[in-house]
Amino acid sequence: MKNEFQVIAELIEKEKKVLDVGCGDGTLMEFLKNNKKTNIRGLEISKSKVQECIAKGLTVIEGNAEKDLAQFPDKSFDYVVLSQTLQAFLNPELVINELLRVGKKAIVTIPNFGYWRIRLHLLLKGTMPITKTLPDEWYN
């Protein structure tokens, strides 16, 4: 598991209700479910990633956080996690506000865009690189 996921897991208390927004293949969800005994749900925009999660026995719905977080009641989760996904949204402020509304606590992580290799790639190619931690194209 990525070091970042271990840090996130340390911030979450056992047996709490968690929503993982942009949960990808469900790696963090699996870890929290098995090691923290969380009641965890996921929201993911990619149909194939949703299917991967469901195949692992995880509860995930397909949806776009910019629109679909509005369907969740206020403070319906103890924690809402947004890991390495904020940069993909057209309206990140809206998403952050929805995270804070839906969860009692929000945990948000972002890629380190200051890392010299990422900056060099951006300078030379004009796009963000595709890496192990950012495997999808999310930029225009």
Label each residue range with its predicted role.
Residues 1-15:
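Conserved alpha-helix/loop element of class I SAM-dependent methyltransferases that forms part
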